[in-house]
Design a protein with these regions (language model features):
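N-terminal, positively charged regions that mediate nucleic acid binding
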Residues: 22-31, 36-38, 43-44, 175, ...
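Conserved inter-motif catalytic segment of the P-loop NTP-binding fold
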Residues: 94, 102-105, 113-114, 118-203
């Protein structure tokens, strides 16, 4: 009886997520009913939160399609020809871009080169690293060239702190390296888990759209060459850039 009670208590305090598509289930499943992938469910603990305080709902207006005035889309060039090409001519304000690829293929170096070019155009860029120290970033930057004072660095993984820094500094472009190292205090699971990746991406999407800041997210890949984490990560972003190289090259 005690064993059954403990098992029931565990079920109430944990949930299973599909790492491929983010499908949620109260129990473990061998095959996901949503994406049909096998052995992709992982268990995560959940924490009950206090009921949300009811707020007054304000009236909002609706509009017709013909009444919408289109603004000319302004793009910011990265001055990297091929990157600008795959981005449709440059960076769009308020866009969320996922950059994936094998370890060591050059994701961080390319984005640092992008930061250099943007900062030389007097664009305020915030590079947030959860994997390297400031000294390591500077050593890598010195191999690229001279940077302007428009590039700002931050070593932090707490998303709540990062959100506060972004609101204070108001950068035009943000680099998150990487999404798997970020965590929110609102979620009790470990960094890199399905819940944390989904929460972090959702927060960054709100920042990008609400403040019209372009956000680049670096994502790790699995041994199979797929972006690590739930498929919902790829669905939430505006653009997915994937770097491939010859793994057998010397």
């Amino acid at each position: 009886i005690i064993w059954k009670e403990n098992r029931m208590a565990k079920a109430k305090n944990s949930v299973f997520f599909c790492q491929e598509c983010g499908y949620e289930s109260a129990k473990w499943m061998g095959q996901c009913p949503a994406c049909h992938a096998w052995n992709t469910f992982v268990e995560e603990k959940i924490e009950k939160t206090a009921p949300a305080v009811k707020k007054m709902v304000q009236d909002v207006d609706v509009t017709t399609l013909n009444a919408i005035e289109m603004k000319e889309e302004q793009r910011i060039t990265t001055q990297i020809k091929e990157l600008d090409r795959v981005l449709g001519g440059g960076i769009v304000k308020g866009s969320l871009v996922l950059v994936g690829g094998d370890p060591g293929i050059g994701k961080s170096t390319l984005l640092l080169q992008c930061c250099k070019n943007l900062s030389m155009q007097k664009k305020k860029v915030l590079y947030i690293s959860g994997e390297e120290s400031l000294q390591q970033i500077k050593l890598r930057a010195e191999r690229i060239g001279k940077f302007s004072d428009s590039l700002f660095l931050l070593c932090e993984t707490n998303l709540n702190i990062i959100h506060g820094v972004i609101k204070r500094e108001k950068p035009e472009i943000i680099i998150i390296d990487s999404i798997q190292t970020m965590y929110s205090e609102n979620v009790t699971s470990a960094p890199g888990s399905v819940s944390q990746v989904r929460e972090a991406t959702g927060t960054l999407m709100q920042i990008a759209k609400g403040m019209e800041i372009t956000v680049f997210i670096v994502g790790h890949v699995t041994k199979e060459g797929m972006v690590a984490g739930p498929k919902v990560l790829e669905h939430m972003v505006d653009t997915v850039l994937y770097f491939e190289g010859d793994r057998h090259a010397s």
